Amino acid sequence: MSVPARVVTLLVAFALVALGAVYVVAHFVVGTLPTVDYTHAASGGVVNVVLQETPENDSSSKPDWVSYYVMKPGANPFQPSSWVHTTLLSVPANTRVNMTVYGYDGCTPPRNNLWSEVQGTLGGVMSFRQFLNANKPKGPTFVTSTLNGWSHCAVGHTFAIPSLGLFIPVASPDASASLCATAPCVAGPYSLEKFSFRTPPHGGDFRWQCFVPCGGGFEFGTGGPMQTIGYMSGQMAVVGA
């Protein structure tokens, strides 16, 4: 077989493997997780989405993995039954998304301090506030375009949708705080973070994930929960009219 023919054969084989991986993720991983539907919760072109990130989770297979949870629309964030262990959610197209993130996990310095910068939000900023416990603030609310994870222990994870140019550092509780020990977290110290962005005018599926090396026990911290849907990686379905 000639060299060009071998190259073509290898490229075709690689493409088939890649397509197979996409099929497995789409049909076996995503297909087994529930999707929290926020499309019917939108009003006046606005929808409020609530997440939390935790130092552990309530699964039987990987309970020690850090994870995101999605709250049911309009639920009470301090009731365990309000939270769904999934990273799949759906929102309407051409809608302002007001996102709230309850950060219960400790800090992990980002590998690149680019992830300390707020990118793609409306106004280019986000707000955060530290809490000692449910609705017990520790200090004032800060509005910022940067949460420097290198100068001090401040960033727990990130929420990023690369295809929308959206990257937000998620604040961690105070470095001396005792972290939540039972997920979903409804008590203990946390950071409360808020930011807004607009969904595209068309429907589609958009991958989101954390870019902080939060995969403890894996090489470079980038494996395990960081790349697994249902933990620190997820999908936002934008539903067109």
Predicted regions and their residues:
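Extracytoplasmic entry segments of secretory-pathway proteins
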Residues: 1-149, 161, 240-241
